[in-house]
């Protein structure tokens, strides 16, 4: 076990005094790291995630290289879907492709339930390896939100308009709600197993939920999100972060959920979120594209985010989306260092 652990992010969420604003980056594990790219010449994403030693190495890299205040487990939101009967393939340049999309309630009924110890032991073994031996910062486990997972399962892959997904919601509520309930059950078991293995925070990625309006979110999504988070928290008092893209119109709905941290994309400032009545710890939210700019521009954009975060009092610095592969590792290191220095108290 690691002594003198850096628990800054957990202290921030609890409202305790911290020495600086904690920082981590979505997609910090992999992508822009040369060590990771070298591994990808030999191994696929699923190859790496199925080998705990390799997966732990990739997960740990950004903590060593960028001095982040948290690690996030290297895996894909599709990980729990394969074991329940979803024929998913990760295609380069496309993303997840589902070869047996959900169309009817019979398709939902064919899905099995997940047994994490049996179906994803490599995920749990990676977490145990990290938390028992090496990691000196909290580990973030994660899952895709039911809507985002369902959208892939129904559309058959990434989508711009989510027409098939919305059509199912509007035309066939029985199938939609059956799928939502099944995915909540899967997610609760999957997340709970991660926490029991040693994850100290959970992030729920609802990447595509911004495609819905408020009325549809309330009717078709919100009750299932409440059940997912509540059932996890009934088992373990673990902080939960929720993040989505292009979903500022849903901020008040998210603030109602039993989450601890609300992740902002780059379109909504911390001050705007406060003005909308958000009471949660806020996470974010530098536009990841800014990391491709010269350092003076990056620093200029960092300061107002950090100033607003310090004024708010409960802020975790992150990007407003994931790290782009083109971002230089040195840039991420400098951002992390700047956040720590600028917010030092």
UniProtKB/Swiss-Prot annotation:
The record marks 76 as: Transition state stabilizer. Pathway: Porphyrin-containing compound metabolism; protoporphyrin-IX biosynthesis; coproporphyrinogen-III from 5-aminolevulinate: step 4/4. One of its GO terms (cellular component) is cytosol. It is an enzyme of class 4 (lyase). Its EC number is 4.1.1.37. One of its GO terms (biological process) is protoporphyrinogen IX biosynthetic process. It is found in: Cytoplasm. It comes from the Bacteria. Pfam families: URO-D. Coiled coil: none annotated. One of its GO terms (molecular function) is uroporphyrinogen decarboxylase activity. Catalyzes the decarboxylation of four acetate groups of uroporphyrinogen-III to yield coproporphyrinogen-III. HAMAP family: URO_D (MF_00218). This is Uroporphyrinogen decarboxylase.
């Amino acid at each position: 076990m690691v002594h003198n652990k850096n628990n800054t992010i957990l202290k921030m969420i609890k409202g305790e005094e911290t020495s600086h604003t904690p920082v981590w980056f979505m997609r910090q594990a992999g992508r822009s790291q040369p060590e990771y790219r070298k591994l990808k010449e030999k191994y696929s994403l699923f190859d790496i995630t199925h080998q705990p030693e390799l997966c732990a190495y990739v997960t740990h890299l950004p903590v060593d290289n960028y001095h982040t205040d948290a690690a996030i487990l290297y895996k894909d939101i599709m990980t729990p879907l394969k074991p329940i009967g979803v024929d998913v393939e990760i295609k380069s340049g496309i993303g997840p492709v589902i070869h047996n999309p959900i169309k009817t309630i019979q398709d939902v009924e064919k899905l099995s339930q997940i047994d994490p110890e049996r179906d994803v032991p490599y995920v749990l073994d990676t977490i145990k390896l990290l938390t028992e031996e090496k990691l000196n910062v909290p580990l973030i486990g994660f899952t895709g939100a039911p809507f985002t997972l369902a959208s892939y399962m129904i559309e058959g892959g990434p989508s711009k308009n989510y027409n098939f997904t919305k059509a199912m919601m509007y035309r066939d509520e029985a199938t939609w709600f059956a799928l939502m309930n099944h995915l909540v059950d899967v997610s609760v078991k999957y997340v709970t197993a991660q926490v029991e293995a040693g994850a100290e925070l959970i992030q729920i990625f609802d990447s595509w939920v911004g495609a819905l309006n408020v009325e549809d979110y309330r009717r078709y999504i919100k009750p299932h999100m409440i059940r997912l988070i509540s059932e996890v928290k009934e088992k373990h008092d673990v902080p939960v972060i929720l993040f989505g893209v292009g979903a500022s119109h849903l901020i008040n709905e998210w603030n109602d959920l039993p989450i601890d941290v609300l992740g902002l994309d780059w379109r909504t400032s911390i001050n705007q979120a406060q003005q909308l009545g958000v009471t949660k710890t806020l996470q974010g939210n530098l536009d990841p594209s800014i990391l491709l700019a010269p350092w003076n521009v990056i620093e200029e954009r960092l300061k107002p985010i950090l100033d607003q975060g310090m004024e708010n009092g409960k802020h975790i610095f992150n990007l407003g989306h994931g790290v782009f592969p083109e971002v230089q590792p040195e840039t991420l290191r400098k951002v992390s260092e700047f956040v720590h220095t600028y917010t030092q108290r």
